[in-house]
Amino acid sequence: MSGRSGKKKMSKLSRSARAGVIFPVGRLMRYLKKGTFKYRISVGAPVYMAAVIEYLAAEILELAGNAARDNKKARIAPRHILLAVANDEELNQLLKGVTIASGGVLPRIHPELLAKKRGTKGKSETILSPPPEKRGRKAASGKKGGKKSKATKPRTSKKSKAKDSDKEGTSNSTSEDGPGDGFTILSSKSLVLGQKLSLTQSDISHIGSMRVEGIVHPTTAEIDLKEEIGKALEKAGGKEFLETVKELRKSQGPLEVAEAAVSQSSGLAAKFVIHCHIPQWGSDKCEEQLEETIKNCLSAAEDKKLKSVAFPPFPSGRNCFPKQTAAQVTLKAISAHFDDSSSSSLKNVYFLLFDSESIGIYVQEMAKLDTK
């Protein structure tokens, strides 16, 4: 062998390549030593730091891509990154003080501001406060009069008291106390026939304690409980609710697209659960089928003579409906249903929302009902 043949030169691997990460480990090590030169920094500290930053960046990009897809955009914009951070609770806490350039702001519209809008169909609700009592000359003259001028209370008969109590009873019965604790009503709007549409914010784990007469459960043809809404209902209702769903599956399953079936809500605060087979986004006439699904849910609630019903957001799980499109179709179907019907047992329709993006979309779309 000749002495000229030496060892092959090995290409140097960077610390990032050896650790299996993309972010520069050596640069992070220099930054850590620069600011904290007093402390001893281990070799694995910048590797762990690079891995965490890389994971957070990938998570934000994935959520931003979902937001761009829901808004029917081909590219990710700073607005989508802002929505991605706002929709994730942990990322929102981590990046609370971070300002994203050209990201815009999240809508936070108070119900009082929405109630002042004027429109043809919507009826603004104003709370009338009693006028303050006037202290005039009568009070002064009463003091001068001494003991003789005593304040006399107007006598009310028993019949008038009974009438007042009856009026209070009827008003309380028509206007319900609300969906219960843990549910915040953000805004509301009244339609022509008196039906009240309310945007309600809560956590998905509280859906079992919502005090309404009917809850809509978007599902598949097999009436399974594999999606988020179904899992939350199963967790709240327990074995009793699961057995009720199994009996419904045997008697009325499988459901056709846009078909609705009603079951008892065992273990839940609501009286009934309306299971509906929602269409898949991208299928033929999917928007028309979703509109038909919502109308069938309302008809099923009216058949049971329910007074209140709650709709969760329809872009759930595997159907991949864009949030903007689903909100537009939902409000259009509900408004058309009550316009076509001369009378209805339903008085309150709640939209149960869980994330800030859906709230902003529904606030925007409900405001458009005034201009129609």
Curated annotation (Swiss-Prot):
Tissue: Present in liver, kidney and adrenal gland (at protein level). In the liver, present in cells of the bile ducts and parenchymal cells, but not in hepatocytes. In the kidney, present in proximal and distal convoluted tubules and in glomeruli. Present at highest levels in the parietal layer of Bowman capsule. In the adrenal gland, present in the outer cells of the capsule.
GO terms, molecular function: chromatin DNA binding; protein heterodimerization activity; RNA polymerase II transcription regulatory region sequence-specific DNA binding; structural constituent of chromatin
Annotated keywords: Chromatin regulator, Chromosome, DNA-binding, Isopeptide bond, Nucleosome core, Nucleus, Ubl conjugation
One Pfam family cited in the UniProt record for this chain: Macro
Any GO BP annotation: brain development
Modified residues (N6-lactoyllysine): 7, 9
Record carries keyword Transmembrane: no
UniProt crosslink position (Glycyl lysine isopeptide (Lys-Gly) (interchain with G-Cter in SUMO2)): 239
Function: Variant histone H2A which replaces conventional H2A in a subset of nucleosomes where it represses transcription. Nucleosomes wrap and compact DNA into chromatin, limiting DNA accessibility to the cellular machineries which require DNA as a template. Histones thereby play a central role in transcription regulation, DNA repair, DNA replication and chromosomal stability. DNA accessibility is regulated via a complex set of post-translational modifications of histones, also called histone code, and nucleosome remodeling. May be involved in stable X chromosome inactivation.
Protein name: Core histone macro-H2A.2
Organism: Mus musculus
